[in-house]
Structure formats: C-alpha cells, structure tokens
Amino acid sequence: MVHLTAEEKSSVTSLWGKMNVDEAGGEALGRLLVVYPWTQRFFDNFGNLSSSSAIMGNPKVKAHGKKVLTSFGDAIKNMDNLKGAFAKLSELHCDKLHVDPENFRLLGNVLVIILVTHFGKDFTPEVQVAWQKLVSGVATALAHKYH
C-alpha cells in the first residue's frame, strides 16, 4: 500500500489535530460536488445542488462531509492498515452505492486543497508529501473491493 515515515505520520497527525472536521468536511464534499458535478448523481437525495452556493450551504452536504472526514480520522489512526480500516466502506461503496472509485482520488485531492486553505504556511511541501501519500492510500483502500 502506502508507506509513511515516522516523521510523515507525525506531521499528518499533528495537522489533523488542528482540523475542524465539521467545517472542513462540508467544504471538501461541497467542493467535490461543485468542481466535479458528475459526482452529484450519488447524492440525489440531498435536495438543492443547483449552484455552488446551494451546494456549499446545503446542510446534508455539510453533514455527510463531516461523516466523510470523520472516517478520514479513522485512516489517520490506522495508517499502517488502511485496507483493513476501509474494508467495510469499500464494500459499501462498491456493492451497494456503485460509486466510481476514481471519485475517491478526486476527493483526496480536494481534501489537500482544503488543508492548504486552512493551514497556509503550515502546509509545507513536506507536509503535502505526507498527505498526498495518505489520500492516495485511502483512495486505493476504498477502491480495493472493486478489484
């Protein structure tokens, strides 16, 4: 899977400890739905997704975004076993929800953008390396059931 050094794990954990999951989760999922509008088809029960402002202000988007980032917190607790940590979510997204696994990669990239906007100068290139490894590993773990 993905190998993070002890230093990379520390930088991920440190930054995550400062993360406002409620706020950032809604931002990340909202941005995914705005930037990649075809992903909206998986959220047809979320109500008004007709514009960027409607999406970013949608309470269901915010609530599900929080849920998504909370599961990312689980990844941080299980960086050495992402496949195991995401086995059930992989099965759910593959077998029941039929989500295109490419969307996991897109969400990971959006999360990195959210981290940059929230942490600015603290999100150094070295910190980004660690986070890119993590979001790539999470995307691979979530896509595991598809193979």
Curated annotation (Swiss-Prot):
Q: What would be one Pfam family of this protein?
A: Globin
- Give all residue intervals belonging to the Globin domain: 3-147
Instruction: Give one GO molecular function term.
Output: heme binding
What Gene Ontology terms for biological process does this UniProt record contain?
A: hydrogen peroxide catabolic process
Task: Name the SUPFAM superfamilies on file.
Answer: Globin-like
Which residue positions does Phosphoserine occur at?
S14, S51
Sites binding heme b sit at: H64, H93
List the InterPro entries: Globin, Globin-like_sf, Globin/Proto, Hemoglobin_b, Hemoglobin_oxygen_transport
State the PANTHER family in the record: HEMOGLOBIN FAMILY MEMBER (PTHR11442), HEMOGLOBIN SUBUNIT EPSILON (PTHR11442:SF7)
What is its biological role?
A: The epsilon chain is a beta-type chain of early mammalian embryonic hemoglobin.
Q: Oligomeric state and partners?
A: Heterotetramer of two alpha chains and two epsilon chains in early embryonic hemoglobin Gower-2; two zeta chains and two epsilon chains in early embryonic hemoglobin Gower-1.
Q: What is this protein called?
A: Hemoglobin subunit epsilon
- Organism placement in taxonomy: Eukaryota, Metazoa, Chordata, Craniata, Vertebrata
